[in-house]
Structure formats: structure tokens, C-alpha cells
Amino acid sequence: SLYKIRVAELENILEPEIVDLKLLRSFCSNGIPDCNGFRALCWKLLLGYLSPNKSTWTETLRKKRELYNQFIEEMIIPPGENADGKCIDHPLSEGPESSWSTFFKDNEVLLQIDKDVRRLCPDISFFQQATDYPCNVVSESRERKLHIRVAPSTLSSANVERKGLGVTKINLITKRATENYEAMDEGQEAHWEVVERILFIYAKLNPGQGYVQGMNEIVGPIYYVMASNPCVEYREYAEADCFFCFTALMSEIRDFFIKTLDESEGGIKMMMNKLTMLLKEKDYDIWMRLKEQELYPQYYSFRWITLLLSQEFPLPDVLRIWDTVFSDEKRFTFLIKVCCAMILLLREQILDNDFASNVKLLQNFPPMDINHVLSKAFSIN
């Protein structure tokens, strides 16, 4: 079958001691076979976590996983105790060396992360399930679980709006059962708890940027691919591998998340402009219709681009889109083509609809065969 032929073709590309990245990119842009952990391996190569030289893989993975364990020891274990649980610092200590002041600041970041990861990819149950490989130094101690830190300060997770002279109105976001995933017992961890830790460590290591809402949607699919690898030895280290792949990807898209870089070459405004110009060139009528309705790209494509379309399609389709996006040497040229294709495929409706219906249509992209969308995108020169 065609599928078996593609699997054999990929095996041949991955066989040499030095993988030909150009060949790999060209193969993966048509989708990576969903078996044998191929996608996890190819993404590691395409995102630059692993070098094309296979003789370096074992050592790279060992070093990176060791480094990640250090991050956990430094950033997750509560101040006042070291890895073996001995008390060394006190929360009321005001000494400049006390880690408690940072600990309390961190909690603000954690509140947002906690809220976001408890709703990850709701169309599948994966993130609510227990991982086979909980992080031992964390799962065995209740205090080290990040969501436990958040629990006492739920009030602050309310939306606080300042009105005039410091009068603060609080809209409490009430927990709805369908939204928030439950935590696991001691000794166990759900996948969403692992993702929470990855994001928290990332925020700690990147204080200039910190955590921005939406990063959870970028890390989710990467973690899913690493943690559902059929190969046990890779699945066991899904957390560390995901962290470094996510970090590599974020270094390329961080401009989308940083307001001050909006005007930069890679900033989100620039990307939306590219989409508008491409649309104008490919279908003047649609472009004109949206322009007349003053339906600007930021109403819909801001989310499309920033979150790499992770919200517009079901997870299997997102993985398929990302195969091509990660294979694209210019990285986000193809992403813009997919966004353009999505609009072109809604031509009739957009030309018929009024402003309100078009906003609704583009903000809630209708179900569509992903192969249809991709072949349209590939046809855009």
C-alpha cells in the first residue's frame, strides 16, 4: 500500500549516519507516517533538538535530560527544602538570599498556567489521563505539585478590573466541571500536570517574556507526540524532550507573543499583513469584500497565526499541518499559505455573508477535510 511505501521511504532517509535534512524536509512536508515514533523523531530533527549526525544523539539526549532534571530540582522543589526534603529556609525569612519572595511571585504566573492547562485539547481525553512516568521527586510529595501551590490563592485568579480610583471589581470565574481537569493522587500525575511543569520552568528560564496565554496550546501537541511515542525509552523522557522542542519552537515564534516586537519582521502584524497581501493577490473579490466590511485580519488571523492553527482544527489535523510547517525552511511562509487557503475555501459564504456572519465564520472555522485545505495551500505559489 501507499502507506507502507512511505514508511519504507522514511526508514531509508533516516538510515544513514548523517541524515540528509533537505530530503527529510521534503518528505515530511507531505505528512509523517503515524507509527513507530516517526513523528517524534522527525520533529526533534526539524526543530533542531537533534543534529543530523546520528552519532551525537545518545549524548545530546543524555545531557539535555540531565539538564532538565536540574531545572526541576532548582525550580520546582519548594524553597526551604532540598531534594531530600530537609528544611533549609523559612517562609518568613526576609534575608536577601531567601527564595520565598520569588516563590510567591511565581505563584501569580502559576495561576494563569494552571487555569490554561486544565482545559488543554478538550476534544481528547489524553491530558486527563495518568502518565506512566510521573516525575518522582515531585509526585511523591504533595507540596511539590504545582497545582497544590495554586489552590490557596484561587481568589486571585479572578478577573480583577480597576475602575477609576482604585475601586476593584472582581468577576469570579466559577469552575465548571466540564472545563477543569482533576488532579491525580500522590504518586501519580496526569499529563496536564506535566505540561504545567514544562510551562512553569519555561517561564522561569525566560523572565523577559515569561508565560503568555496561548503557549499552552503550542506545547500541548508537542507533548502529545512525545508522550504517545510507542517506543518506551522515548516515552519515559517525553517531558524533557518536549521541553527542549517547545523551547526551540518558541525561539522562532516568540515574536508573535511579544507586544513590543509587533512591528518586527517576524512580528504578528507583519504576518497578518503578509496574509492580507497574499489574499489580495489570489482572490481580489474576497479581499475587497472583507475590506468593505472592515473585517480586519486581527479579528480572526491573530489567533490562527499566533497559535499555529492549533485552535482551528482537531488535534490529528493540527499534527498534520505542523509536519509541513516544521519542514518549511522559511518556517512560516507555508503557515500563511494555509491561512490563505482556509479563506479561499470559504469564498461563496464570505461573498454572501454580512459582517457579523463573516466574523462568526472566520472565528469558528467550519470542519473541513484537512487534505483539501493543504492541497489548496500547496497550490498557492
Regions from the language model: what does each represent?
Residues 37-41, 105-108, 112, 190-197, ...:
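Residues within HEAT/ARM-like alpha-solenoid scaffolds
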Residues 35, 212, 313-317:
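Helix N-cap / loop-to-helix initiation motif
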Residues 1-208, 223, 229, 349:
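N-terminal transition regions in large eukaryotic proteins
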Residues 2-3, 78, 83-84, 232, ...:
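Extended, Lys/Glu/Leu-rich amphipathic alpha-helical scaffolds
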Residues 128, 178-188, 201-206, 232, ...:
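Active-site-adjacent structural elements in folded domains
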Residues 30-32, 326-329:
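Solenoid-like repeat scaffolds
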Residues 196-204, 216-227, 244-248, 277, ...:
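Contiguous, well-ordered alpha-helical segments that form the cores/surfaces of helical PPI scaffolds
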Residues 43-47, 58-64, 134, 212, ...:
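Short amphipathic alpha-helical segments embedded in low-complexity Lys/Glu-rich regions
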